[in-house]
């Protein structure tokens, strides 16, 4: 695995870490003195219904907040709609206290009843298939927490057992407006499913989308742009009592091609750009002349990795989704360990990421409080092709006279790697993986 450093070009000189990427609008409390920002996304939103979203390219970080949020710089939990929370000594109960006088974007009060509705009627509803439903289940019995209203500002979650991720993962989910969505949850469509599932699609008029975040949707033009305007009822103010956000409008341009992202930025049509490894040198040379600044935002939380298809199921005709011969290789722990030793991550860092990156040996990001470092005992797989070959032969694999790897039945070990074709750095990673694996047969 390898990770790149998050490099972002900012065109407006007064920017700092205000908005380094479209997915991190929670950093919008920096004192920015501009009224409009132009950003880019590679894909249209697929829905305006938070609970039904499955796409990484969504409008929701702009328009919704949960009880708590994660600080985009130091990754610590901070109050959001809840001004505070208290965990019981036995860690089985968490009590949240909402901020006073919260409002939705239509001016109606946001209350504990909205929190109750969001979790009990939507997220815990077995008839509503949310992407994150399973992450809300706790313990061996996979049960949801119970939820209880204590008073007009306090709500209590009772967990079946201590569950540390609850605060960071579950309490950060968006709170939804009961007054706008309750009827759709309680009524069914012609197929017997809650109408909520098809409510607030991208064809919904923006004024009907009720939100609680810093922005609300002003307009959406498919394949072109989403325009956000500030939510006048957003709860947050600066130290002088001035309403946030400072930026009153965001134009989110929908441009699939990353090459066009670069062209639009260089022509001045975009205010921000996530810098790709292959374009870093070009932009760094243009930095002074172009009157923009490249900020090093630190390590990304995402990782690049190779994964094997371990699906042993079959289709309706009884044909296995994965060739049983290859499946046998993939399920062999020694085979996977040998692959890990065979990949030269340092070369990836130098050649593909131009030296701007760090090696990552865990699926858990270094910024996470749950990260285990190599110094703390995490097993690592440093580049060692000789060891990779040794592991393979000890596991029953063999080499022919041409040094080609064969399995125990004498079959040549070959498989395909699928990679996202729109991402040049990923293609380069896949090419190097191919070269490294050829080196062990």
Regions found by a protein language model. Give the residues of each.
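Hydrophobic residues in beta-strands and at strand termini
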Residues: 41, 81, 87, 97-98, ...
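N-terminal lobe/hinge region of extracytoplasmic solute-binding protein
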Residues: 40-89, 120, 127, 210
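Residue-level recognition of beta-strand termini and adjacent short loop/turns
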Residues: 88-89, 151, 222
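Surface-exposed binding/hinge segments that line
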Residues: 134-192
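A structural "hinge/loop" feature
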Residues: 41-58, 81, 108, 131, ...
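Extracytoplasmic/periplasmic ligand-capture domains
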Residues: 22-29, 72-73, 99-129, 143-147, ...
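Short, low-complexity disordered leader/linker segments with a strong preference
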Residues: 1-35, 146, 401, 405
